Amino acid sequence: GDIDGVVQQSRLNDINPSDIADIQILKGAAAAAIWGTRAANGVIMITTKKGKKGLNIEFSSSLSLDYVNREFQKQDKFGQGVNGNWAANNALSWGDRIADRSGSDSFNTSGAKFVSEDGSVQYPITHKGDQTTYNQSNRDQVFRTGVTWNNNLSISSASEKGSVYFSASDWNQSGVLAGNSDYRRTTGRLNFDYNVNDNLKLSMKNTLAKVFSNRVQMGSNLNGLYLGYLRTPADFDNSDYLGTYYNAAGVGTMNSHRGYRNYLGSAAPTYNNPGWTLNKQVNTSDVTRFIVTPELQYKWLENSTFIARVGYDQSTDRRITYFPYRSAASTSTGSFGDNFITESELSMHLINQSTHKISDKISMDATLGYLYTDRNFFQIGGSAINFIITDQDRYGFFNSTNDNMTPFNSISRVLNDRYYGMFDFDYDDKIFLQLATAAEASSTFADRFWSPSASLSYEFTKDMKIPTLSYGKLRASWGRVGVAPPAYITGTNYVSAGSAS
């Protein structure tokens, strides 16, 4: 491929780690019993902090430095070429032995040339005699010391009537790649709860995150970083990657791209020069995310509590990709993409939790619940190729003609609801039985799906005193879970076909 190679980040990154109080992992059927088919592979439950008694103000600031501690070794014995002979623009590094060269290059200064941004000139080489190798300088073009500043402020307070927790954070990172490789996350959070009386409690959690990132193409990718970097011969200097190419008639082409597969920059090289990938190409993501979760807890019986929770999570993500004119492969004529994505999820969760003492040694915790979710996805954007203006960096659709633009959009909505029950039995605090069942319906499949599960565990170290074993448990479980299909896979799509003569 020539444009793949930028992996979008997990939205878990939107959470400030300093706000996290607890993380729990629920696996398999136990997770699906509560959270449904989306949790068939497990659930990560993250609990954020709440206020502490008194007035608490905390501030932290940290600086981290990142280094690449292991790299691929590159040979420096043989030059560019094949069969023991130096050859310009060749893909391989099986040329002549560098140490056996005469010590200086010969050039043709009467024809084409490449003038780099700093004024240095590259002429066609007629004889390769220079013994200089560039593995170290080429490496230094790619890697740098990564720098991360992490600042956190939190203010919290609590009393008998409730608590409040406020935080703000800023994570600012420049990566170890010496170019368009950076990440910045700014967050704010406000959590509070209020005890109306002994039986009624109100709470709300709010968070806002702003995340901007710019990432470098990677992988087996003609526009990627490592393909061109690792294949660069030891005797080729990657530093002058950008400049003006002049043909034999003296006509100049600005914004030309020079790499070891085209060392005069007369056309796009087969692989990008790493400097071009790092500094000219753009892959940005600009995310704004807002989450609000109000909750009501009402203790309506001595052993029963009713919980009503509503959650709304919305994020917008604008992604821009830019490959300048004379990038590698199919993007050699320029490519631009602008993609705007909005995702939202509305959830309503009704839960009743109760505790029952059956006998002196047997107790049961019962959870009955209903969960409704409404997920929406909207995407609109377009791509443009074959740039009109090629000697300058121009971002936007205005730099292509209409027939070189491709608009696109996508809309998706998925509704789910589920009823569930979970019953946990405890015998003498050593034998535990859990029985659960759920009935789920989704707009992506027709029939309501039942997912029963059961688990039995025995903490045998309560009865067997084993000096070398402080804790031991035997556990067996069974469950049936399913995964809902994606939206609209049973639909018949209309695609406008082109005409051919």
Feature locations, PLM:
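N-terminal periplasmic accessory domains that precede
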Residues: 33, 39-61, 127-132, 153
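Short acidic/polar hinge/loop motifs at secondary-structure boundaries
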Residues: 1-27
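Extended, hydrophobic alpha-helical segments in both membrane/secreted and soluble proteins
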Residues: 20, 188-190, 304, 348, ...
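Transmembrane beta-strand segments that form the barrel wall of outer-membrane beta-barrel proteins
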Residues: 170-172, 433-445, 476-478
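Surface-exposed loop/interface segments of Gram-negative outer-membrane beta-barrel transport/assembly proteins
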Residues: 53-133, 176-184, 189-291, 307-417, ...
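Residues on the lipid-exposed face of transmembrane beta-strands in outer-membrane beta-barrel proteins
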Residues: 48, 147, 153-157, 190-194, ...
